Amino acid sequence: MAMTYVISKYLDEKTAINVRNIAANLEDQRWIRRNELTPPRQVENSTCAYDFCGHSQMPKHAVDFLKNIAPKFEEHRLAEIAINRYNIGDYLGKHKDFDHYRKNLVISLQDSDNGVYIHDDDTFVKDVIGQGVCIDGIGPVHSVAPVNRKRYSLVYLYE
């Protein structure tokens, strides 16, 4: 099975800033700390340390806004929305995505030297506000190295 992904601009800067502001203003109790990766996502005993806020933890106005701006893909239905928050030093080790989602779109909400490393292609995708990596299926092995400043990413999962 071919592992494919597309790097493209998915949100304009103003919209991405609005999403980042929503994320930055979420109360601490809405965030879930993730400290482990487990098979089948985990690759080579990798670990993680970052905060996750799924749509079930978000206020309704945030979910409605994020659904409204979600990119549309023919033959794919939006199934889940999440925001990942990385504080300085946080990371997401080598992993593949779950196989029950057909597309996994991760959009950067800031410009920075941080980003996503795609191991299979030895490619680093630097954070560019509004730019995303859209992975088909489980996709290639990828990770986020320890970040040097606060980082937010918007995640859309499609069935």
PLM features: residue spans?
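Short glycine-rich loop/turn motifs
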Residues: 80, 102-105
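Conserved short histidine dyad/triad with adjacent acidic residue
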Residues: 82-98
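Catalytic core of Fe(II)/2-oxoglutarate
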Residues: 100, 107, 111-159
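Short, conserved, surface-exposed binding loops centered on an aromatic residue
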Residues: 71-75, 95-98
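A short coil-to-beta-strand element that immediately follows conserved catalytic motifs
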Residues: 74-82
